[in-house]
Structures are given as structure tokens and as C-alpha cells.
Amino acid sequence: KTCENLADTY
């Protein structure tokens, strides 16, 4: 959901 979350997923 958050940019940080996306970075963690990618």
C-alpha cells in the first residue's frame, strides 16, 4: 500500500 511497503515487496 505504501511506497515503503512496495519497495519491500519488490
From Swiss-Prot:
Family: Belongs to the DEFL family.
Gene Ontology BP terms: defense response to fungus; defense response to Gram-negative bacterium; defense response to Gram-positive bacterium; killing of cells of another organism; positive regulation of cell cycle; positive regulation of cell division; regulation of defense response to virus; response to virus
Functional summary from the UniProt entry: Has antifungal activity against F.oxysporum, B.cinera and M.arachidicola with IC(50) values of 1.4 uM, 2.5 uM and 0.15 uM, respectively. Has antibacterial activity against the Gram-positive bacteria B.megaterium, B.subtilis and M.phlei, and the Gram-negative bacterium P.vulgaris. No antibacterial activity against the Gram-positive bacteria B.cereus and S.aureus, or the Gram-negative bacteria E.coli, E.aerogenes, P.aeruginosa and P.fluorescens. Has mitogenic activity towards murine splenocytes. Inhibits the proliferation of M1 leukemia and MCF-7 breast cancer cells in vitro.
Keywords on record: Antibiotic, Antimicrobial, Antiviral protein, Fungicide, Mitogen, Plant defense
Protein name (record): Defensin-like protein
Superkingdom to which the source organism belongs: Eukaryota
